[in-house]
Every structure is written in C-alpha cells, then in structure tokens.
C-alpha cells in the first residue's frame, strides 16, 4: 500500500468528563492505575513491586486499581506475598463518571502496560490533569508527547524512581500535567477528529468519483 493512501486519525478523549475537579480534593499518596484484565500484559506486577518498595518511606501510599483480580489468582497471591494488602484498593464496575472521580482524587497515574492499542487510560489520566508515569511502548509515546514520565516496560525500579520524583517535587510535575491536559484538548478532541473523518471521506469520494 502506498504511503499516500495511508491516513492516521487517532481516537478521542472525553476531556470534559475527565478533567480536574476543584470540588474533589486529592488524597495524599493516592496512585491510580487501570487493569481492565488480570493478565500479565497490563504489567501490574511491576507497579505492585514498586509500591512494596515505597511503603517503608511512604507508609500512606495507596494504589487504586480500576479493575478486578481473579480470586486466588496470580495478582492476589503477589499482593499477599509482598505484604501490601493495606496499600491496595480495587474498584470494580465503575461508571465513566466514577472513574473520572477516582482520577481527580489521585496524585499520580500509572500505565505500566507491556503493550497498548490506543491507550485510553493514558489520555484519560492526562485529561484529568494529574502527573502520569507510562511505559514507552506501542502508541503510548504518540499520545503523551513530552508530558509524561516515560519508562521502560517491565521495570519496577523505574516506576519506583518516578513515583519518588513526583512525590518529592509536586509543583514541577503538576505544571507538566497541566500542559499535558492542554495537549490532549488540542490533539484528541472528538469534534476535531470527527471533522478529520469527514474530510477524509469527502476526499475518497472525490478521488473515486466516476
């Protein structure tokens, strides 16, 4: 296929729903991550390992996981092995509005996936205006640009180090998060994306008009 016949149009992010909420205070030490499926591909193990290392110096640290663990499964056993049950909270069956509230409550978002398609949690975290740590894989750097802490996949040390950096200098990373929200609004607006599809469809019709 010729490159002139390839068009890339991203998905959009609902930046009105996922937004900073002045009436919702951030909970000190709260970190949020999404594990829509309890599978290794989500890289949750590495975030859990980082939390286990941090809890000594940051005993108030709390990881909110949007998703569910399999009863008696690998993740549940790992949490028990690391002795971090008190630092982990699972939230399941949430509406989009409730997920947006969890983001607004949090100080840091982590996407530790080993692979992602578009990566909606990345864009939703950025739209929420909170500092983001994300793996430098697949489409993630295309979404984040320079507005997130990009780290290697499968690297709990990098997650740990990034969390310490953010908790140690909130103003610096909050400023970048604020710019990250602007980046999402400018580049992942559903209205602009719909206009891109409209223009592309019109062009195709014109090109193939008999």
Describe each PLM feature range.
Residues 12:
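Carbohydrate-associated surface elements
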Residues 24-42, 48-51:
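Conserved donor-binding/catalytic core segment of Leloir-type glycosyltransferases
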Residues 34-35, 62-76, 92:
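Glycosyltransferase donor-sugar binding loop
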Residues 76-94:
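Nucleotide-activated donor-binding/catalytic signature segment of Leloir-type glycosyltransferases, i.e.
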Residues 93, 101-106:
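Short alpha-helical donor nucleotide-sugar binding micro-motif in glycosyltransferases
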Residues 114:
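Aromatic "clamp/platform" in nucleotide-sugar-dependent glycosyltransferases that forms part
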Residues 131-134:
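Short hydrophobic beta-strand element within catalytic cores of glycosyltransferases
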Residues 149-156, 165-170:
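Conserved acidic donor-binding segment of nucleotide-sugar-dependent glycosyltransferases
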């Amino acid at each position: 296929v010729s490159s002139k016949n390839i068009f890339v149009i991203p998905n959009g992010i609902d930046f009105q729903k996922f937004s900073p909420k002045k009436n919702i205070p951030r909970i000190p030490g709260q970190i949020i991550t999404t594990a829509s499926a309890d599978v290794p591909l989500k890289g949750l193990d590495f975030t859990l390992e980082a939390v286990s290392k941090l809890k000594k110096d940051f005993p108030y640290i709390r990881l909110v996981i949007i998703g569910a663990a399999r009863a008696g499964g690998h993740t549940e056993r790992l949490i028990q092995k690391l002795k971090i049950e008190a630092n982990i909270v699972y939230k399941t069956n949430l509406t989009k509005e409730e997920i947006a509230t969890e983001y607004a409550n949090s100080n840091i978002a982590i996407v530790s996936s080993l692979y992602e398609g578009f990566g909606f949690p990345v864009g939703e975290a950025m739209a929420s205006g909170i500092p983001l740590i994300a793996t430098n894989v697949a489409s993630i750097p295309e979404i984040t640009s320079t507005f997130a802490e990009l780290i290697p996949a499968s690297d709990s040390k990098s997650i740990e180090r990034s969390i310490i950096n953010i908790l140690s200098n909130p103003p610096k990373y909050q400023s970048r998060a604020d710019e990250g929200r602007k980046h999402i609004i400018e580049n992942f607006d559903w209205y602009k994306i719909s206009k891109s599809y409209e223009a592309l469809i019109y062009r195709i019709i014109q090109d193939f008009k008999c």
